[in-house]
Amino acid sequence: MVLDAVGNPQTILLLGGTSEIGLAICERYLRNARAHIVLADLPGHPGKDRAIAAMTAAGARSVEWIDFDGIDTASHPGVIEAAWGGDTPRDVDVAIVAFGLLGDAEELWQNQRKAVQIAQINYTAAVSVGVLLGEKMRAQGSGRIIAMSSAAGERVRRSNFVYGSTKAGLDGFYLGLGEALREYGVRVLVIRPGQVRTTTTIEHWRATGAKEAPFTVDKEDVAELAVTASTKGKDLVWAPGLFRYVMMVLRHIPRPIFRKLPI
């Protein structure tokens, strides 16, 4: 792990290179020190130029773009190899896994194609890159992985059970990966946010008529929590922190009662 004199990462990889939360986490790291930022997202993504400009404006030492398609798992080894410098190897100090789909909850459980698609991206692709990140960081003997999960995966609800089930799978995988990599000097942080105010979620609320839920946070709040918790070596946090206790209660409500709750 190549850190500067005060422990700041020198190279940060963002899988989901246009993710507003992921970019906010990168920006939070850049407040501490300049770093090389590697953004990986879909070829020709319309948000590419905006993401690169945001990282440059935030003080990145340099910004690199790598084409990354979550569904094309066969291409993932090449993506991760490129992130580690390809023919000129380098360490990646922090890798952020922040790609995913939300989708329309009622459509998802009635549309086989879209249900499979969200499962492939939110879970299968996350496992694919997680294994590869683990291999690389284990070999370098250090590193931090930050995986964006969701409170929706802690206890899957009828209102969004397809999405929630994919996050439950991601959550379990990365918690387990953290245990497996701990002895090799690698730390994995799983973040379980509730609703986060981003362009994507705001558009989703408008399209579906949904309302902002209690405990909704800004992406900057999640970023602050992510950087602080990862630096401290934590393995699991909620955003906001109070959500931990809310979910603790919800997790133990009997199912006949739980299904009647307006959530």
Name each region found by the language model:
Residues 135, 179-183:
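Alpha-helical segment proximal to the catalytic Tyr-Lys
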Residues 84, 91, 100-116, 159:
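Conserved mid-core segment of classical short-chain dehydrogenase/reductases
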Residues 55-74:
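Rossmann-fold cofactor-recognition segment
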Residues 190, 210-248:
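C-terminal helical subdomain
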Residues 150:
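Residue(s) in the substrate-gating loop at a strand-loop-helix junction
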Residues 18-19:
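Conserved glycine-rich cofactor-binding loop
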Residues 130, 166:
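Active-site helix of classical SDR
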